[in-house]
Amino acid sequence: MIEKKIIADKFNSNFIWIFVDAADKYPKQMNIKANQEHIIYGEKCRLVGFLETESPSTGRFSTNHSTWTHSRPTVSGERFTHSFKTLASRMERLDQTISDRIRIVDGEISRHSDNEKICEQAACTLKTCDNVIVDVKKELEMLHSLRLEDQKKSLMNLIAKVQKSGMIQDLEKWRSLMESRYIFDNTFSSATPHGVLVEMCQCLELMSSMLRSVEQSIADRNHNGVTEKQLHEFKLAFDYFDQEKNGWLDYEHFELCLKSQGYNFSVESTLKETMSLLDPSTYEKHDYMRYMVKHETTNILDDHSAIEDALKNLDARKISDSMSRKEAEFFMSKIAKKAETSSDQVCLEYKDFVNSFY
């Protein structure tokens, strides 16, 4: 009697696999509907068992049904044979891989959530620091209208305010934290901790430079005797040529500003040398003020000596020989204002006349 072994096809309920005997390596596929007498539905469901992960239509069982061989060979021509234990082990590894992937994804979600909070907090700090920088720059623009002593006091207060606020340390902390977490794009702010930190340091350096300049101007003023009125005139001259209100002058306007104060540079190299002493690129107001305070007394004394020397060899008979008619009229009008009349002779103390120009 021929013994038939029947295995149900999980993927197609209309078919089963029939092994006629143990020597039969190639099972026959039978239509259930056409052969109702060979199998009942309950038997099919019982035998489906452990074949839930593989498709019988793509492989063959061994004679003892304990191993499974893929019907499709690999590129090298080999066929893989798997036991049910091997398949179970692969399933365990697959479950472990899925668990690891889920854990990694959860970690990434948590990291992105933390990064978003960091970006939001950093944006608040950046906005605060940016507002402080804007306020400091506005106060610096107003310093030029103050006396030197008031400028010095205001600059010292501004520097202390920025240094004691701890903003530089906060910016360093946020920059280090965001770099360590590879955060290079903040959706809450277009500014970066590094950019704001650089701007803050530049602002501090500018205030320190202005403070040194003001202190030097005070020392030069006290040494040379420049008055507050003269300082005010220097500022007015600078503001007149600084038509764009940038706080600095280019080469051409700086030259005009100095010449308007009585500095006549006959040699071009002399002007360039003077400008290089201030700033090789632009000529800012505090540099200009420092230069004027330092050199104004010398300039006045040189002019004073030149006028005295000219008057020593000048009398009424030589006026027409030494000056044009227009210059002579201007000169005589100055003399008339300071002249002292004694009978029919007009005389003038030339030192008093020279002092009248100042």
UniProtKB/Swiss-Prot annotation:
Keyword Calcium: yes
Signal peptide: none
Keywords: Calcium, Metal-binding
Superkingdom of source: Eukaryota
GO molecular function: calcium ion binding
Annotated EF-hand domain residues: 229-264
InterPro entries: EF-hand-dom_pair, EF_hand_dom
Residues where Ca(2+) binds: 242, 246, 248, 253
Keyword Methyltransferase found: no
Protein name, UniProt field: Uncharacterized calcium-binding protein C07A9.5
Organism annotation: Caenorhabditis elegans
